[in-house]
């Protein structure tokens, strides 16, 4: 007959057989508890351009603030229309059925103001909006470098934004206090632009007449 005490002593218990699995499980339980107590924040962003700063002259002093959670960004910049030309000679020509418009702007702002990731658009008399991408034929194999213009000078963008809206300090060459910006548009032939709009996302925008 088998001695029950001997059987118990000779066979490892369940906890002993699975001690490695238990040891690996404990850190996972700690992470799960920590994740359950993590505070999530939902950021709601406006989707319409409801707060326009519309000028009746060729210049607009644009001042606007926007919030990314607990981070607030303030933009303070003067935007001026320098000139507008149609189908001038260059590396970009109009695709069939379109007309290319070249808009020259001048920006002026303190070097510490974040101005990257802007959007420049044209509007017609019906309020239709036209962007800078598409409708243009480039020379040879050159890509359309005018599709997404920046509102900052090349090599000196000034402060940039992190994914959470945090303003990152500028690196490299300091941004000047004023500089030119060129935006190139292709619009349907026969459509006349009446205004240029500059923004960094809704709801705020600056608008100048042409």
Specify the residue positions occupied by each region the protein language model found.
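Conserved functional micro-motifs across diverse proteins
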Residues: 2-210
């Amino acid at each position: 007959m088998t001695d029950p005490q001997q059987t118990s002593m000779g066979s490892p218990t369940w906890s002993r057989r699975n001690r490695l699995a238990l040891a690996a499980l404990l850190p996972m339980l700690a992470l799960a508890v920590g994740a359950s107590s993590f505070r999530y924040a939902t950021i709601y962003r406006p989707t319409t351009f409801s707060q326009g700063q519309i000028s009746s002259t060729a210049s607009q002093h644009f001042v606007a603030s926007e919030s990314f959670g607990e981070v607030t960004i303030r933009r303070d910049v003067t935007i001026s229309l320098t000139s507008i030309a149609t189908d001038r000679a260059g590396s970009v020509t109009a695709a069939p059925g379109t007309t290319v418009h070249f808009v020259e702007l001048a920006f002026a702002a303190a070097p510490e103001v974040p101005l990257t990731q802007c959007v420049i658009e044209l509007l017609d008399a019906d309020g239709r909006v036209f962007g800078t991408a598409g409708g243009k034929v480039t020379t040879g194999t050159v890509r359309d470098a005018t599709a997404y213009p920046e509102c900052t000078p090349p090599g000196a963008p000034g402060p940039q934004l992190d994914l959470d809206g945090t303003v990152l300090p500028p690196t490299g060459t300091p941004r000047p206090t004023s500089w030119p910006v060129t935006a190139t548009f292709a619009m349907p032939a026969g459509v006349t632009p009446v205004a240029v709009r500059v923004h960094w996302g809704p709801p705020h925008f600056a608008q100048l007449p042409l």
